[in-house]
């Protein structure tokens, strides 16, 4: 089949970009589909994840809307982006003649009802509605999508007007090594350094309990707009000896094995890819029960500790408990390894191929 992925931008270093490119590569290289990725926005940044030679990549070179202008100019800028994107996307689709188009993120939701053509239109939801900017556009998209694919059952229940909603979770690659030393007094947190990930409250909770785990260290991997602010928070909290911002890692999947506990403080997620990555390495997680996905991966007391969203006192207690018990870390980590088979690349790509077979 001829397949197109439409996404606003593919140059980011986040989990969504990694998953989209990974799926496109697998569908082309392993299942022999004809795959094209269309990226709307122009960018000087390199693509962070390798695109298979069998996958065609097209940039529409649309300049993002300016926001440093008055309200009237902002409306003009948004209309310019919409019309340019629509015209250039239609031109590409006329040339490709795809059998199915996957639309991703907000710009994808906006484009889906207007691109026309006979191709099946599939929207991929990578975030809860409450955490999706301008999510009202998704309501119009529901009326036109042939299928909406979500990562979790919770997110699926938010789409009540689409005729076909399916749940296909993310997959994670198998790390080259797993956790061996559960006695290591090292904690890890991973994600883009922006407000939704809640790293500010993680640092605050680490400070509140530092006397109870003075011999532990916390490494936070990721880049983003809050980097300077978080660094200043670490300094002002006198945590420079125990908390480090490690920046971006191009091989994060193999970092988890160097730690004995994973901490996740997100306010919201599409699924929480880092939970799957930690699980694949046999690393137990302490996580808030965010919408959506935490409870799909972590069963409280079995393979990690699940804390009611925003209950920082309970999170601090859970964090200290697992850091004080090597036995719990080992037991929960080994259970994570047993459960990780649910999210292998082979099993998840099979679900995508079954969806495409329904259209053939």
Positions of predicted regions on the chain:
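Donor nucleotide-sugar binding/catalytic pocket of nucleotide-sugar-dependent glycosyltransferases
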Residues: 126, 130, 143-177
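Short His-centered aromatic/hydrophobic patch
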Residues: 85, 102-109
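Conserved acidic donor-binding segment of nucleotide-sugar-dependent glycosyltransferases
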Residues: 299-301, 305-312, 321-326
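A conserved mid-protein helix/loop that constitutes part of the nucleotide-sugar donor-binding site
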Residues: 14-22, 185, 189-214, 225-231, ...
């Amino acid at each position: 089949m001829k397949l197109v992925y439409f996404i606003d931008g593919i140059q980011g270093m986040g989990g969504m970009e990694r998953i989209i490119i990974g799926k496109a590569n697998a569908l082309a290289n392993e299942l022999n589909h004809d795959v094209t990725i269309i990226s709307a926005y122009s960018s000087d940044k390199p693509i962070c994840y390798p695109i298979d030679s069998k996958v065609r990549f097209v940039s529409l070179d649309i300049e993002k809307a300016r926001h440093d202008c008055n309200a009237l100019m902002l409306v003009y800028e948004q209309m310019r982006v919409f019309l340019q994107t629509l015209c250039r996307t239609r031109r590409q689709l006329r040339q490709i003649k795809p059998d199915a188009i996957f639309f991703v993120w907000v710009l994808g939701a906006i484009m889906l009802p207007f691109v026309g053509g006979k191709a099946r239109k599939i929207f991929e939801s990578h975030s809860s509605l409450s955490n999706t900017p301008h999510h009202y556009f998704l309501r119009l998209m529901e009326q036109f999508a042939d299928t909406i694919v979500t990562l979790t059952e919770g997110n699926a229940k938010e789409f009540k007007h689409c005729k076909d909603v399916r749940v296909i979770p993310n997959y994670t690659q198998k790390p080259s090594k797993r956790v061996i030393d559960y006695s290591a007094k090292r904690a890890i947190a991973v994600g883009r350094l922006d407000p939704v990930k809640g790293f500010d409250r993680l640092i605050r909770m680490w400070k509140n309990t530092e006397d109870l785990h003075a011999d532990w260290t916390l490494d936070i991997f990721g880049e983003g707009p809050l980097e300077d602010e978080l660094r200043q928070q670490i300094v002002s909290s006198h945590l420079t000896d125990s908390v480090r911002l490690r920046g971006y890692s191009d091989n994060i999947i193999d970092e988890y094995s160097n730690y004995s506990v994973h901490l996740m403080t997100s306010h919201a997620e599409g699924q929480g890819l880092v939970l799957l990555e930690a699980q694949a390495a046999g690393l137990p997680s302490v996580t808030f029960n965010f919408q959506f996905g935490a409870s799909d991966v972590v069963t409280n007391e079995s393979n990690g500790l699940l804390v009611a969203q925003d209950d920082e006192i309970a999170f601090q207690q859970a964090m200290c408990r697992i850091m004080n018990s090597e036995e719990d870390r080992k037991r929960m980590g080994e259970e994570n390894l047993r459960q990780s088979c649910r999210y292998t690349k082979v099993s998840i790509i099979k679900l995508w191929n079954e969806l495409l077979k329904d259209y053939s």
